[in-house]
Amino acid sequence: MTTTSAPARNGTRRPSRPIVLLIPVPGSSVIHDLWAGTKLLVVFGISVLLTFYPGWVTIGMMAALVLAAARIAHIPRGALPSVPRWLWIVLAIGFLTAALAGGTPVVAVGGVQLGLGGALHFLRITALSVVLLALGAMVSWTTNVAEISPAVATLGRPFRVLRIPVDEWAVALALALRAFPMLIDEFQVLYAARRLRPKRMPPSRKARRQRHARELIDLLAAAITVTLRRADEMGDAITARGGTGQLSAHPGRPKLADWVTLAITAMASGTAVAIESLILHS
């Protein structure tokens, strides 16, 4: 009974959800229809705000904005990647290490003074990192990759006065964003093929190191070959479609919903700064 129930429990364990990058979640919503430049401006503004005002109020209000945007965009819970166990262990070790630093506030437990300052600082940095990661994930989940490069070219148009090659940078960004998912898939296939290869355990430690070195060299050579092949195919496709200028020539301008989004973000940011500066520090 016990020997058969254990495999059953292991067999019904849910598989871990992988990290999906640069692939939008299917659907139609107000967040999906926003101009890509608006999303980039919101991410940039919130990042600057959290850099200069990394308080709990600011983090909480920005987290509320991200959660509201995810709810409006109908982002399913399955889109969230599974947190690996080793990351929880690293966070626990970091929390314990930071808690040893002490600091204010101090809590008395059974006559022992415990400083919670280090632990609170660690939790605040962790929460800030989660908010920034969620912002980037929202852009990835609701934005087509082809819309990012034209938005960067449009936003960087004022810098052309300084002779900054904005269009060339936008084209390079478009190529990188389009090549990244393909290369990730190719590397996963190469890694899976390497794991399926039959292995013989060398008798000595030196032989094992030599085998690992040979496998690493073979994997790097295959990765370079795949990268060059994909680059050649992408170059042919770009040439057939009219050159690199078409990559940053996607029409797109802010609409009413974009201005409303920027206004809501500015109001929330201003409210958070006012609470942090005037009320909590008065």
UniProtKB/Swiss-Prot annotation:
Membrane-crossing segments per the record: 18-38, 40-60, 87-107, 119-139, 164-184, 260-280
Keywords: Cell membrane, Membrane, Transmembrane, Transmembrane helix
Main location: membrane
A Gene Ontology term for the protein's cellular component: plasma membrane
Membrane topology: Multi-pass membrane protein
Superkingdom of origin: Bacteria
InterPro entries: ABC/ECF_trnsptr_transmembrane
Protein family according to the UniProt entry: Belongs to the CbiQ family.
Protein name, as recorded: Uncharacterized protein Mb2352c
Organism: Mycobacterium bovis (strain ATCC BAA-935 / AF2122/97)
